[in-house]
From Swiss-Prot:
Cited InterPro entries: AN32, Leu-rich_rpt, LRR_dom_sf
Main location: cytoplasm
GO MF annotations, alphabetized: histone binding; histone chaperone activity; phosphatase inhibitor activity
Family of this protein: Belongs to the ANP32 family.
Free-text comment about domains: The H2A.Z-interacting domain (ZID) mediates a direct interaction with H2A.Z/H2AZ1.
Name of this chain's protein: Acidic leucine-rich nuclear phosphoprotein 32 family member E
Assembly mode: Component of a SWR1-like complex, composed of EP400, KAT5/TIP60, TRRAP, BRD8, RUVBL1, RUVBL2, ING3 and ANP32E; the complex does not contain SRCAP. Interacts with H2A.Z/H2AZ1. Interacts with the importin alpha KPNA1 and KPNA2.
Originating organism: Mus musculus
LRR repeats: 18-38, 43-64, 65-87, 89-110
Alphabetized PANTHER family for the sequence: ACIDIC LEUCINE-RICH NUCLEAR PHOSPHOPROTEIN 32, ACIDIC LEUCINE-RICH NUCLEAR PHOSPHOPROTEIN 32 FAMILY MEMBER E
Keyword NAD attached: no
Disruption phenotype: No visible phenotype. Mice are viable and fertile. They display a subtle neurological clasping phenotype and mild motor deficits. Motor defects were not confirmed by a subsequent analysis. Deletion in embryonic fibroblasts results in the appearance of a significant number of new H2A.Z/H2AZ1 around the transcription start site as well as at other chromatin regions.
Domain of life (superkingdom): Eukaryota
Length: 260
């Protein structure tokens, strides 16, 4: 399938300015040149044209937002200065499996100031003595060459980098929320709840206290009643005793009169 047809198929009824990623791998470049891609793809951030028999970048449109460019397994041998002119914000460039042979060809990438990762794997240039040291010296802005930095530490996967960025954004949002504190009125509501709870407890204690006092009063009244009852019984017993003595004296007096 030709590149122009492949582009139309990948659009899927979208306008070119709505596309941020475009994969055109394994299609065919007529005469080894880019066709069907133009300046209307101004929002493009990722472009892949791997194994499309591309030999020239002369017809590459201006893509100022492009960050990642995949050009592996083509027949590019030069003309890399176009990249700095058309895609000045590139951070990742894959030229592995192309016809790049010498350092002078790569030197054109010095003007890509934001370039961090470059792949030249399976290019003839990798057979040069001190290849890695020479590239890092020539392109001092890059961090990773063929997937590794100067200390042979492997480059993070691009998807992991994206995830880290998202996690970083979420952490920042959480920190912002923590710094902002609780929403307005939140503390006041808590205080109101505590006051209500306190008043409920106070009312409960008052009710318990009242009931306790009422019980004491009732008990005191009962005790007073018992005391009154006991007093009345004692008075009755005393009165009966007095009446008994009086009857006894009356009987004795009657006896004395009979004797007379």
């Amino acid at each position: 399938m030709e590149m122009k047809k492949k582009i139309n198929m990948e659009l899927k009824n979208r306008a070119p300015e709505e596309v941020t990623e475009l994969v055109l791998d394994n299609c065919l470049c007529v005469n080894g040149e880019i066709e069907g891609l133009n300046d209307t793809f101004k929002e493009l951030e990722f472009l892949s044209m791997a194994n499309v028999e591309l030999s020239s970048l002369a017809r590459l449109p201006s893509l100022n937002k492009l960050r990642k460019l995949e050009l592996s397994d083509n027949i590019i041998s030069g003309g890399l200065e176009v990249l700095a002119e058309k895609c000045p914000n590139l951070t990742y460039l894959n030229l592995s499996g192309n016809k790049i042979k010498d350092l002078s060809t790569v030197e054109a990438l010095q003007n890509l100031k934001n370039l961090k990762s470059l792949d030249l794997f399976n290019c003839e240039i990798t057979n040069l003595e001190d290849y890695r040291e020479s590239i890092f010296e020539l392109l001092q802005q890059i961090t990773y060459l063929d997937g590794f930095d100067q200390e042979d530490n492997e480059a993070p996967d691009s998807e992991e980098e994206d995830d880290d960025d998202e996690d970083g954004d979420e952490d920042e949002e959480d920190e912002d929320e923590d710094e902002a504190g609780p929403p307005e009125g939140y503390e006041e509501e808590e205080d109101d709840d505590e006051d209500e709870a306190g008043s409920e407890v106070g009312e409960g204690e008052e009710e318990v206290g009242l009931s306790y006092l009422m019980k004491d009063e009732i008990q005191d009244e009962e005790d007073d009643d018992d005391y009154v009852d006991e007093g009345e019984e004692e008075e009755e017993e005393e009165e009966e005793g007095l009446r008994g003595e009086k009857r006894k004296r009356d009987a004795e007096d009657d006896g004395e009169e009979d004797d007379d």
